[in-house]
Amino acid sequence: MSWNISHPQLSDKLFGKNGVLEEQKSPGFKKRETEVYVGNLPLDISKEEILYLLKDFNPLDVHKIQNGCKCFAFVDLGSMQKVTLAIQELNGKLFHKRKLFVNTSKRPPKRTPDMIQQPRAPLVLEKASGEGFGKTAAIIQLAPKAPVDLCETEKLRAAFFAVPLEMRGSFLVLLLRECFRDLSWLALIHSVRGEAGLLVTSIVPKTPFFWAMHVTEALHQNMQALFSTLAQAEEQQPYLEGSTVMRGTRCLAEYHLGDYGHAWNRCWVLDRVDTWAVVMFIDFGQLATIPVQSLRSLDSDDFWTIPPLTQPFMLEKDILSSYEVVHRILKGKITGALNSAVTAPASNLAVVPPLLPLGCLQQAAA
């Protein structure tokens, strides 16, 4: 079954001009203190995916190296501070079921034994009670019983997909309750079914998960009202004092829409590291790391009456492997909420209370 992606005119109408994603190219490779080493990468990873992995740190350049069954990269982040922050946030993080090894580029890091993983037996699935997109989901294939070499392991990797942190109930319950005082609109989301057009705002690469806006007349009206209000308020809203920025702060920050330009958008502070804040852009379903001094105040409830424009979805059968789908319309059928979960203590996954349905989209045939 193939994608049914509409022409970009509708997304242009909502966002502006048509944007084209371009891969940054390296004029030459030279190790610098502003570069970060990213090791234990999948063999088939592209430069574009590496840049996306470090998108929160505004990477300038990437140099990918593949040696036999090993793949690693050096990424220029532009400053030593960003290198330190990237190491803190990404080292040890699971990426395509591989533990990333992130370090400075001063010397090649030693390969640790826990980085060499043999195929594991499938995790145990259990039925989750209720509905909610705070569930941890898994799609699993049987792993081979006999040991294989690392090259063969790359080809036989199990298709395991866990609901990302920002889509889980433990995160969203806190976010929505602190941002929106009136949650009566939640009932409408539970009732959404049938044929739909979804304007994709962000994806989780090589998984079935993505954030999208359900294209309706109501969405168009909400977008116009919200963006008009934020545009008028932006210059009047003061920048936040550094001491007031903490987890749970409602604020306004500049969101990058690629070639579409920039837009000030509602966001919620998830964490703070020195002079950097990790924020969730409410209306685009996107996490980003931005300077604390660039945040503006947006604590009045008047700015939080319009529900979030976007929500998470999961494809029933396919995965998203191309970034070209971002800012495009996907057409398909919303079949319901995700209703299965996985118990996997070793992988630090947890079943959490339901809140909203993680919409399951059945792709339309081409």
Curated annotation (Swiss-Prot):
Disulphide linkage map: none
Key word RNA-binding present: yes
Signal peptide: none
Pfam families hit by this protein: RRM_1, TUDOR
Domain (RRM) ranges: 34-107
Domain of life the protein comes from: Eukaryota
A Gene Ontology molecular function term of the record: RNA binding
GO cellular component: membrane; mitochondrion
Keywords for the protein's UniProt record, in alphabetical order: Coiled coil, RNA-binding
Coiled coil: 216-237
PROSITE patterns: RRM (PS50102)
Tudor domain location: 210-317
SMART domains for the chain: RRM (SM00360)
Name of the protein in question: Tudor domain-containing protein 10
InterPro entries per record: Nucleotide-bd_a/b_plait_sf, RBD_domain_sf, RRM_dom, RRM_TDRD10, SNase_OB-fold_sf, Tudor
